[in-house]
Amino acid sequence: DLRVVDFGTGSGCIAIALARNLLFPEVTAVDLSPAALATARDNAKRLFARITFVEADILALNESTPASLAGSFDIIVSNPPYIAESEKSTMEANVLLHEPATALFVPDSDPLRFYRSIIDYAVVHLSPAGTIYFEINPLFVNQLADIAAAKGFSAAIHLDSFGRRRFAVLKKKSEN
């Protein structure tokens, strides 16, 4: 079975899409917010998606890994908070009204903290041929690629529909 984990699942849309479209996946969806997990559970049930839900702090993964997140995963996906606090004034009002601030914003002093924690987790828990898929703030793509390289990952950057560097695909570098 293909083991997949979605960090910062929110409403569960990514985890649900993967659970419904991959062949025999074992999908785990992680979020710190009990309210987000309740919404994700309801959405998964309504859409007949088999998913294990875990309440955990992405930033504490490496200090205390829950049993359901032990072992290796073939795919890690995450759309973590990535908007710097200083960008808040440029946000559309409808986004600010409908999304919790904790799901959107990161401190200007450490905008890549979630990515760093997930990459550190992946060093141990991503299978050798596994892949990490991130959504990222275009302002921080180069820094993310540097962090990935320092931890032994290659990073391919992909554009969104507006031509912005928005997605990063990381793979462990081969040891050859």
Kindly label every feature range from the protein language model.
Residues 82-113:
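Mobile active-site "lid"/loop adjacent to the S-adenosyl-L-methionine
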